[in-house]
Amino acid sequence: MKIPTETFKSKGIEYIQRFEYNELSRASRNGKRHYETPDGRQVPSVTTVLSATKDMTHLHAWRKRIGVEKAQQITTESANIGTVMHRSLEKHVKGEDRTPGSNLIQQKAHAMANVIIDNGLNDVSEVWGSEVSLYYPELYAGTTDLVGVFKGAPAIMDFKQSRRLKKKEWVEDYFLQLVAYAEAHNKTYDTDIKTGRIFICTQNNEYQTFEIDDYAKWTGKWYAKLEQYYKKIL
């Protein structure tokens, strides 16, 4: 639903409310994240679909190589850093005050957020929404970090933390997330978003970014994953 445009600027960020984004309720089914859409249906999250259809060979090999306890420690620490970094970036986008925090994880996440702000968000000319709940009726839902305009084009944008720099072949799920959110936005709000951008900062403060290079290809792969998921659970 499009609404009358409201614009405000804070700390250099132009926040333009072009659409009425409603937060979706989250639910857990068999331990997997789902969302409740406005029609009352519960649909799987994008990450639930991707997790259920992912080849886990490399992950299992990594856990076996370093040990389950060490792997869990790394996973938990990375998740905590990612959560704090996302919160810091959300505050920046909304023009709220940000502080480095008092513990090492907070300080590291704050520094990583600064890297993304300085290297990636400078090319964002409009922000339409932050932490936006999106859904494709009857199929899936999810939350994207940012919807707005990147280098002149409407875009879905996500923030990621990493322990090291990524190769393109390692981030296929990121592309699938982006097109899933874009397809949901286009369906629900009658838009034509074809641009998606991932902003990454490593825990050593190295910046990296990836953009959807072939929207049709990645959209096809996403719908194939979705079909695989529903065949698996039905």
PLM region descriptions:
Residues 1-141:
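Metal-dependent nuclease catalytic cores that hydrolyze phosphodiester bonds in DNA/RNA
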Residues 58-65, 226-234:
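Short, surface-exposed secondary-structure junctions/capping segments
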